[in-house]
């Protein structure tokens, strides 16, 4: 029987800084300061023997590939047990200066081709995708205090969270009256309605993820009734 060549692409979105036995990133999120010439992201190959072809690209908030940033190198080979740095350079597109803008960077790793006992080619690709926040230079230097500004309101079975700050706020361990609900990312200067419906709701607790990827202390806030 003629040997069959096949490629299995398994896209794995990793939130951890290092992917054991393969390729991982040195951060779980990036802050791109507008006054910086560039930002860098460390890429690590923890495999002792395999080399990987690394391909990187940027996406906008809607998940569409964008040329708003230049990535260099966009394609290269990462040898076993080595590290490299990907540079991200903003191209100067006009963006809002009173709030952050959200992008994503995807780093795809394609290993060197191997063959199984039947002679078939095996190739597994993985992709790490993290948020990139473009931060205008005009914003104040107290982003890590943003969680204290979140307010909540309860009306007609729904809870609405408001973020009056210029920063994106990513919540974790979000609870309404002690009941865990799906965490949300709150865009700057906007309101977000939680998916769940509640028969009653009086209080809110949550943590957020700061600029360094760490969890902030638990914040407690009452829910206003409309």
Positions of PLM-derived features:
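Sec-dependent signal peptide recognition
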Residues: 2-9
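N-terminal signal peptide c-region/cleavage motif recognized by signal peptidases
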Residues: 15-17
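Beta-sheet-dominated interaction scaffolds and their linkers
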Residues: 20-43, 142-151
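Buried hydrophobic-core signal for structured, non-transmembrane domains
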Residues: 39-45, 88, 103-107, 158-162
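Short, acidic/polar linear motifs in exposed loop/turn regions
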Residues: 46-50, 111, 164-167
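Short beta-strand and strand-turn-strand segments in soluble, beta-rich domains
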Residues: 53-55, 59-74, 169-180
């Amino acid at each position: 029987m003629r040997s069959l060549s096949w490629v299995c692409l398994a896209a794995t979105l990793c939130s951890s800084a290092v992917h054991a036995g393969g390729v991982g990133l040195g951060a779980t999120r990036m802050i791109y300061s507008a006054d910086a010439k560039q930002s860098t992201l460390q890429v690590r190959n923890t495999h002792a023997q395999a080399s990987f072809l690394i391909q990187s690209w940027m996406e906008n908030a809607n998940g569409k590939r964008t040329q708003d940033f230049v990535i260099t190198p966009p394609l290269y080979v990462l040898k076993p047990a080595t590290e490299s740095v990907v540079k991200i350079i903003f191209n100067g597109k006009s963006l809002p200066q009173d709030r952050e803008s959200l992008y994503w960077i995807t780093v795809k790793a394609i290993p060197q081709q191997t063959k199984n006992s039947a002679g078939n080619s095996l190739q597994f690709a993985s992709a790490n995708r993290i948020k990139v926040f473009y931060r205008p230079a005009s914003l104040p230097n107290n982003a890590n205090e943003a969680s204290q500004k979140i307010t909540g309101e309860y009306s007609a079975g729904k809870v609405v969270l408001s973020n009056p700050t210029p920063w994106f706020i990513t919540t974790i361990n979000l609870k309404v009256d002690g009941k865990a609900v799906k965490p949300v990312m709150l865009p700057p200067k906007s309101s977000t309605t939680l998916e769940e419906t509640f028969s009653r709701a009086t209080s809110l607790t949550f943590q957020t993820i700061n600029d360094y990827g760490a969890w902030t202390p638990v914040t407690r806030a009452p829910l206003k009734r409309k």
